Amino acid sequence: MYSQQRIFNSKYFIFFIAVLSIFWLPTMSARNLENSKNENGISGSNSGNGKMNSQYNTGSPSAYYSAKHNLRSMLMAPKDYQQKLHAKIPLNLDLMDFLLEYEDEDRSKRFDDYGHMRFGKRGGEEQFDDYGHMRFGRSI
């Protein structure tokens, strides 16, 4: 009994897929084709001079609209994806000068002698011991 019901269900499923592929998919593709024709301004009827609609012969959209689209996508994008409009490094500094200056100032503040990052001070003494391990409790 159970195997016959299972066979009936599988036959019903195959029949449903066949009907779907025969009737529904061609109508959807034809509907998409109609929509694309309407968006491009193509009409099936010919005008009096034997040519298609005048919008069909105008060509591709101008660069003005594509640039406007790109500008809109840049301005509406999340902050992470937006282009930076200003330089992070001032123009009068050379890149090597900037890197050397950055390394001298901030590295001594942020890292200890072992290369471990400092997170701040606790009670006037450093938060790390001589081996770079973080102190949590009493001082040594």
From Swiss-Prot:
Any idea which residues bear Sulfotyrosine here?
Y114, Y131
Pfam family membership, one: Sulfakinin
Please give the PROSITE patterns that the UniProt record associates with this protein: GASTRIN (PS00259)
- First and last residue of the signal peptide: 1-30
Tell me which tissues or organs this protein is expressed in: In brain, it is specifically expressed in four pairs of neurons. Not expressed in other cells of the brain and in the thoracico-abdominal ganglion.
Which UniProt keywords are given for this protein, alphabetically ordered? Answer: Amidation, Cleavage on pair of basic residues, Neuropeptide, Secreted, Signal, Sulfation
InterPro entries found in the cross-reference section? Gastrin/cholecystokinin_CS (IPR013152), Sulfakinin (IPR013259)
Family of this protein: Belongs to the gastrin/cholecystokinin family.
In Swiss-Prot or TrEMBL terms, this protein is called Callisulfakinin
**Protein species of origin:** Calliphora vomitoria (Blue bottle fly)
